[in-house]
Amino acid sequence: MSESWLVTGALGCIGASIVRTLVREDVRVTTFDIGDDDSRLRLIMEPAELERVTLVRGDVTSLEALGGALDDHEVTHVVHLAALLIPLARADPPLGSLVNVVGTTNIFEAVKQRRERIRGLAYASSAAVYDVVDDDAAEDEMAVGHPTTLYGVHKLANEGTARVYWVEDGLSSIGLRPYIVYGPGRDAGMTAGPTLAMAAAVRGDPYTIGWSSRSTFTYAPDAARAFVDAARAASEGAPVYNIPGETVPMSEVVAAIEAEVPGARIDYDDVPLPFPEEFATGGFPMPVTPLAQGVRDTVALFQSRV
């Protein structure tokens, strides 16, 4: 049976890159999002590529809607990304819990009900499951963190949901924890600053990144590749892995932008992020694009759209 993919949250940064990756592999792709703003898809895909994508407007808090999409498109693989990020989950905690926790539970339940057809499930957890006090935990991908944001609590709960579906129902999955993802389409969330700075530099505008921590930076197409590979992996259990990247201070990020856009007016606030600087990786093989190359490619795409 040929592959047919459902990607929830596909209109976001990582989701758009996943859709592009799959389309370029000549795979059938259906997106499932509550909104209809496909600007991130249009930013990174050619019109002919986008015509091959089926866009479905739906809400992950509806088990019926999810089941309908899975059946209508005979889905064989699922990547679940749909979520309210830190600022939105903080602004409306009940809605954040509904989307992030109940929505994810619905994904697992819908896939369980169709396990004879659906061969792979990957979902997004987050480095937000950790706190700065979790430096030791961050050295072990299977360690339990102590999140200090509602979003992080939601993601930690989802990792538990995945384990329970494995233990009680034998439903396999792989969770991946992104940290600082950058690249075209990354324009929302607490850590979008580096990409917003690249876009500002191309426009000739000044920009101040709102934090300064030494952090691990992952290029969005690398994260996309990791999710696709995870959904295809013939795994057993419910493992969770940290997505790798290049760990550098913010000064190196700014320098990489300035190298591509001489005269760029980029600075950053001396504010740390509430997460460890880097994390254990290696449990699941994933690509890592050097930061300088990722910034170069991102700036080039922004320049091509000016």
Predicted regions and their residues:
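C-terminal substrate-binding subdomain of Rossmann-fold SDR/epimerase-dehydratase oxidoreductases
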Residues: D205, I209-V306
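N-terminal Rossmann/SDR dinucleotide-binding element
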Residues: M1-H77
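A conserved pocket-lining segment of Rossmann-fold NAD(P)-dependent short-chain dehydrogenase/reductase
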Residues: A89-R90, S173-P184, L196-T218, D222
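Flexible, glycine-rich beta-alpha linker
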Residues: Y130-D131, T149, I174-A192
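Conserved Rossmann-fold NAD(P)-dependent oxidoreductase catalytic core, especially the SDR/UDP-sugar
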Residues: T105-L150
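Short alpha-helical oligomerization interface
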Residues: P87-G103, E139-P147
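Glycine/proline-rich active-site loop of Rossmann-fold NAD(P)-dependent oxidoreductases
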Residues: L156, D169, Y182-T195, A220-P221, ...
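Active-site Tyr-X1-5-Lys
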Residues: V132-D135, H146-I174
